[in-house]
Regions:
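Ubiquitin-like/PB1-type beta-grasp interaction modules and other compact soluble beta-rich domains
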Residues: 1-75
């Protein structure tokens, strides 16, 4: 295993970031997973994390992320 890689469970699927962003903060992981940080809500290990905390929230190997994309619409 590459020590620079990060293995995560994202929306129920195993994902590997190789190389992992440095530092491995939630905001950088979200961007590395190709999500728009302005359009998602994130649950990290069972806890919804406010967007203001993303720059300081550390993500570790084996963590669980549920990422929900906000979609506009309606009538």
């Amino acid at each position: 295993m590459n020590p620079m890689a990060l293995d995560l469970n994202v929306n129920g699927e195993q994902r590997r970031l190789d190389p992992a962003p440095t530092p491995t903060t939630l905001v950088l992981v979200i961007e590395a997973l190709a999500y728009n940080p302005q359009l998602v809500v994130v649950e990290h290990n069972g806890v919804i994390v406010p967007r203001t905390q993303w720059p300081n929230a550390a993500v570790s190997d084996g963590d669980n992320l549920e990422i929900v994309t906000i979609v506009g619409g309606g009538s």
